[in-house]
Structure formats: C-alpha cells, structure tokens
C-alpha cells in the first residue's frame, strides 16, 4: 500500500456544504418535537458546521474558516484554516478512522497525550483539540488544531542553503530532539516530510504517533521509520537508543548538502548495502552485537572499505564559507562524520552535537535546556486496551481539553508573526517527496507509516 500526498500551490476551489442535522421522528407530536429539539439539540447545530474536503467531511467549530486541504496521509487529512478567535492561520488535522483497530486507537491516544505534554518552540504546538460529537456513544472524530507552517523540509532541501541557514535549521532540529529525549521519548520517525519550517527559518518537528518511551527496548520493532533515514541498528534489529535520531539528522543534513537521498534503499538488504558501500563494512567488534542470523548474513556480504568524508562530501557540494570562522565546509563535514557512524556507541550524542562548532554558534540555554515535558501517563507505551477502552480514554482526553480550553487555546503561546501559508512560490519537488509518495508499508505497526502535514512552500528568510 502506498501513501499519496496532495500538494496545493494555489488556492483550491472547495465545494462547501453547510449541514445542520435535525433527524426528528415524523410521528412525534408538536410538543414532543419542541421538547426533543430543546433537550437534544446537537453541538453541531450551535458551534459547528460541515465542509466537504475531497472525499472527507470536516465538521469543525465555526471559529475555523476558509478551510483548504494541504495534505493527507495514513493517519489523517490536514486543512489550513483561519482561526477567527486567535486571528491567525492554523492547521487542522482530522484523524483518519482512529478507532478502526487497536493499533490506530493506541496511536491516536499516544499522539494526543504527547502533543498535550510537549511544549517547546521547535516542536509543533497543539492549539486545540475537539470533537463534534457530544457523547461517548457517538464519538468517532478527533480534530487536532496546530500551528500552520510555510513548508516542510522536503521543499527546503532542494534550495541552495548558505551555512547560516543550514546550521540554524540543524540546531533547531537538535533542540527539539533533546527536549523529547529529556522525557525519555525517542522520535524514531524523523525525516524531511515531518519537519516543517517558516519563512523566517523557524523549524518545528511534527508527529509523535511513532514516538515510544525509551524504556521499552525489549519490544522494539525494526519497522518504524521511512527506510531512507533508518539507522543501522534499526535495520539490523539491534534495538536502539537516543542515537537513532542522530543518524536521521545526519541523513537529513547530508541530503541538504547533496540535494539527494544518501541511502535510497529499495529494501532492508539494499538499504544496508547502500550504507556500507559509502561508509564501509563495520568492524568485528560491531558484528559481535548482532543476532546470529543477522550476523551470518552481514559477515557474508562483500567487504567495503568505504569512502572518506572529503570524498563523500567534497567542498564543491557546500555553500561558500561564511564570514563566521566556524561555519565552513570543513566544520559541516566534521559534524556529518560524527553523525553518520554505523556503530551507535561511537556516534555523537545530541548534547555533543549541540556543542559542535558548526552548531553551537546558536546555543541558547533557554532553548537547549528547556524544562523536560511531564508525561502524565507513565505507562503510555505499555498500555494495552480494547478498541472501546481506547475510545473512552481518548474521549476523556478530548473532553478534558475542551473543558480547559473554552477559548480554544491548549498551550498559552504567543501567535507567531507570518503564520499564513505562503503559496505564491512553488519549489522544485524534493527527492524526499518521492520517497513519501511511493513508500511501501513494510510490516509497520498496522498503518503506522506516515501522517505528516504537507505544507505549501515559502522561501526561507533570514535567520535570527
């Protein structure tokens, strides 16, 4: 099964349909009708309206206007909208069939809980969550309202970035990852399509549906992220720690430099071959850590010496050196050489990457050392429930949010300037976009493949 994402570079025409449901029994007398109407009038009549968006119907609060579809994926459909209460543009994600099965329900619960807990400038902010249904029995739709960004990293990768922008984007990626790691959350699904940016070079990480607390190592599955960005320990089924995210950042950085995917494997085997052809066959010490069957296969592959990093990433691929003495090709290449290390034990940590000369020019303790998120459900990833039990848990979360956010704001954050989608320019398609549209679902966690928000592109402006 493939995922197909929709791109809208110009304003689409929508067939907008306003639907108010009444549903009375024609045999009931007038007094009964009046009583029924007064007592059972749906929330939809008072607060909501419905809009046809492609093959889906969005039933949203009236405060959200001018809905425009901007993306779709395995986990839902995303629309841009104007929030009349906050006077800003937002993204509204309708979760796709969240109660289809236990895996969908668990993922929906996990995403909702994590988004409510995490509060960092480099992680997408949850502004609101709601459902148009008024009872648990009717409950079937979940809408997440988030910040609206200008583009995803797929589009930015095709741009000629100078060292300042490249370094600043990487710094923000690492800040967001460190914040997640501080709560024991390993993202595991980092890729260009779930990292979004604004025209002022602000970067945010999306999606926590695949995030899993670090303590569940004994149940780790190798089928977690888009293949091109999978770390060797994931490909080889070794288990993983925080360094799995550093490998993904290295792959993204390398793609920024080369403007093409570093390791475009067609399968796990091909992916491993692509890695060792460029980086070399790992040492026997690493091989000893592998399971016997995997080790037997890996040791019987052709041996590769690998290429040096100056050959993998020659100066000609980098932008001209910055006036800043640390933002140079040599420093960028050194960082790549520390991130793209097959053995996770020898791979650079997030903390050390943030101290690297190519990155620490932006170092701000308030961003790097932000208080860790408090995950109130400590058994988030160990929970196992029936679909109905998951449904009740999610319903309680939504009702709790609605109660706390009568004015529609879950996290009290200032409205960023320039939040509108900039769709006046169209960027070349990214190689990573091709990855998304043709991505096969290996034995993922039952549709735990991708739910990225695909935003319209806008040019990157100046860094701070």
Curated annotation (Swiss-Prot):
Motif TXY per UniProt: ranges: 221-223
Membrane is among the record's keywords: yes
SUPFAM superfamilies: Protein kinase-like (PK-like) (SSF56112)
Gene Ontology MF, one: ATP binding
EC number, as in UniProt: 2.7.11.24
Record's keyword annotation contains Membrane: yes
One Pfam family from the record: Pkinase
Function description: Serine/threonine-protein kinase involved in various processes such as neuronal proliferation, differentiation, migration and programmed cell death. Extracellular stimuli such as pro-inflammatory cytokines or physical stress stimulate the stress-activated protein kinase/c-Jun N-terminal kinase (SAP/JNK) signaling pathway. In this cascade, two dual specificity kinases MAP2K4/MKK4 and MAP2K7/MKK7 phosphorylate and activate MAPK10/JNK3.
Protein name: Mitogen-activated protein kinase 10
Organism: Mus musculus
